[in-house]
Amino acid sequence: VRSGMTILIFVGLAVLIVLLGAITYVRYGQPLAEDDFAARANDACIAMRGSGSGVDLTRAPTRGALERARNARLEALSEIRALDQPERGAEPVARFLSAFGETNASILRLESAIGSGGKVAPARRSLLRDVRDERELAAEASIPACGGLAIG
């Protein structure tokens, strides 16, 4: 009877240890994945910022400068998408990526307006609004370095 009780206690302790380990992993393991994603995405965007392909929207940009900025953004976007995105916190990242696409579309509209002699001022204002929204969503997704990438 005594050895049966000892075995039962050891089995109970083993189950308790496994449960505590699982709870600890779920509670603390996932944020590490989120932090790793955010750190790697921020690093990719910081590297792009250092490439000098930014556009200053306080002045009238050239089509070439906009194209270089768009290409740098697309390169950063492909690096971000190649990262393993955590399941938790995926919604803010998805909203940021959507805003990133909207900003890229605004860059194209501004390029077209410059090339066709169209209405540049409204296209520039639209781009500035999209960049502001993108920066807010990047901060919410814990990747602030990616907000407004290549657009000053």
Locate each region found by the language model.
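Transmembrane signal-anchor/signal-peptide helices with a preference for the extracytoplasmic
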Residues: 19-36
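Hydrophobic membrane-insertion alpha-helices, especially the h-region
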Residues: 7-23
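Intrinsically disordered, low-complexity regions enriched in small/polar residues
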Residues: 12, 27-30, 98, 102
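Short, low-complexity patches enriched in S/T/P/G
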Residues: 1-7
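Alpha-helical segments in soluble extracytoplasmic regions
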Residues: 34-152
